[in-house]
UniProtKB/Swiss-Prot annotation:
This is Putative F-box/FBD/LRR-repeat protein At4g00315. Residues 358-410 form the FBD domain. Residues 1-47 form the F-box domain. PROSITE patterns: FBOX. Keywords: Leucine-rich repeat, Repeat. Pfam families: F-box (PF00646), FBD (PF08387), LRR_At5g56370 (PF24758). GO terms for biological process: negative regulation of long-day photoperiodism, flowering; regulation of short-day photoperiodism, flowering. SMART domains: FBD, FBOX. LRR repeats lie at residues 57-82, 87-115, 137-164, 165-190, 211-236, 243-271, 293-318, 319-344.
């Protein structure tokens, strides 16, 4: 008799829960005792994005039977990653049935759907999904139609991810969010024509919000009423022609309508349009800020009275030629800044052009934060061959009086001789405290 036969079923099910679902199912061939143990698994994951036609023929039946035969009192997590339509035998009706079974019979707590289809229309989900009392996490990705009924209530939903889905009408998203009374984390990604013009987020309980928009999605405007928000990330990489000339702040076709966000602590902006005043008006009280502005004009950010008194951490992307202008304005406006990092977003377009005299013309006097508060300075991928970047680095190393650590990374493509020359030049510029640790990589 093998030792596993002496273990209780509860322990064996726990062991199976660490395996991928397809491997857990294979254990049913071991013996009669193992035959149905996998049906007690609290988490089910089906990833069939890469299967042959012959494999796809029995796939729909297998998933249906496994959900019908599921024995656990509740499904903690159900994940479906499927590729169907032109090949295989999975149909939209199958998806509809599986979601219905998970919602009706299994009190699912986390549901994740990623559908890559060849169908003419996105897949419609059952109305019962939008009335599920047990679901806490809902993730919908790709070819899915968010068709929200008039009567909708998700009393337990705390996390919602909507990635590149299609909405049945203009009000679908607003109707959905308005009936999630405890929602805390929301992610909306858009990169297609999805029937959504105005992006309206009115959720009193929301604490984290991530919005990502890229071509060719259309957007008339953003309306936000999120008084409990602590973290905000907005990525808008559409071109101006895709945004209906949103740079015109008086344009009626594109607007921002933000209510106060008194609890906001952290913001992350990746923006490629000029009219960003509305964003900064509501983030002046944050503690952590990350910025990448693909199109920058002085009047778009800096105006009388803009001060970040509580800002302690600043990350700024150096991918654009005018980034140092933005940095100088922020240093002047952030008297209590403690951490500064310059970086480049991975896979981000490089728009840098060397403007050697740009930095020297920006600051009339040393910003207060350099004299009294900045403790950490980090620069990832510093292109020392660009004189503008060398000027910025030398200025900070020369004037940061309270610095505790400075770390600068050069591109790996630089020759050792080139790196050594840059390190020597930067080292000679350093006039910070003797206790400061300076690292070059």
């Amino acid at each position: 008799m093998d030792k596993t036969s002496q273990l209780p079923d509860e322990l064996l099910v726990k062991v199976l829960s660490f395996l991928p679902t397809k491997d857990a199912v294979r254990t049913s061939l071991l013996s009669m005792r193992w035959k149905s143990l996998w049906m007690w698994l609290p988490k089910l994951e089906y990833d069939f994005r890469h299967y042959s036609v012959s494999e796809g023929q029995g796939l729909a039946r297998f998933i249906t039977l496994s959900l019908l035969g599921h024995k656990a009192p509740a499904i903690e997590s159900l994940s479906l990653k499927l590729r169907y339509g032109a090949i295989g035998s999975i149909k939209p009706e199958d998806i509809y049935l599986w979601v219905s079974l998970a919602v009706h019979d299994s009190n699912v707590r986390e549901l994740s759907l990623k559908l890559c289809t060849f169908a003419e229309r996105p897949t419609k989900l059952p109305k019962s999904l939008y009335k599920c009392k047990s679901i806490v996490i809902l993730k919908l990705k790709d070819e899915i139609l968010v068709d929200v009924p008039r009567k909708v209530c998700l009393p337990s939903l705390k996390t919602l991810f909507l990635g590149r889905v299609t909405y049945s009408d203009e009000d679908s998203l607003h109707r959905l969010l308005s009936n999630c009374p405890v929602l805390e984390d929301l992610v909306v990604e858009r990169d297609r024509i999805d029937n959504l013009g105005k992006l309206s987020v009115v959720v009193k309980s929301l604490q984290r919000l991530t919005l990502k928009m890229s071509c060719p999605c259309h957007l008339d405007g953003i309306m936000m009423n999120t008084p409990s928000l602590k973290y905000l990330k907005v990525t808008d990489e559409r071109q101006e022609s895709d945004s209906d000339n949103e740079s015109d702040s008086d344009s009626p076709r594109y607007f921002y309508d933000f209510e106060d966000m008194p609890k906001l602590e952290e913001a992350d902006f990746v923006l490629t349009f000029q009219n960003i005043k509305k964003f900064f008006k509501f983030v002046t009280s944050i503690k952590r800020l990350s910025l990448c502005l693909g199109v920058y004009t002085e009047e778009s950010l800096y105006h009388e009275g803009l001060v970040f008194n509580q800002l302690e951490q600043l990350k700024i992307c150096s991918c654009d030629s005018d980034w140092s202008i933005l940095l100088s304005r922020l240093l002047e406006s952030s008297p209590n800044l403690r951490e500064l990092e310059a970086y480049v977003i991975e896979d981000h377009p490089d728009r840098r052009v060397d403007l050697p005299n740009q930095w020297g013309n920006q600051l009339n006097c040393v910003p207060k934060c350099l004299l009294s508060s900045l403790e950490t300075f980090k620069w990832s991928e510093m292109y020392g061959l660009l004189q503008n970047q060398m000027d910025v680095a030398k200025y900070i190393l020369r004037n940061a009086r309270c610095l505790k650590s400075a770390t600068i990374f050069f591109p790996t493509t630089y020759a050792k001789e080139t790196r050594d020359e840059m390190i020597e030049e930067l080292s000679l510029s350093f006039q910070g405290p003797e206790t400061c640790q300076v690292f070059f990589h």
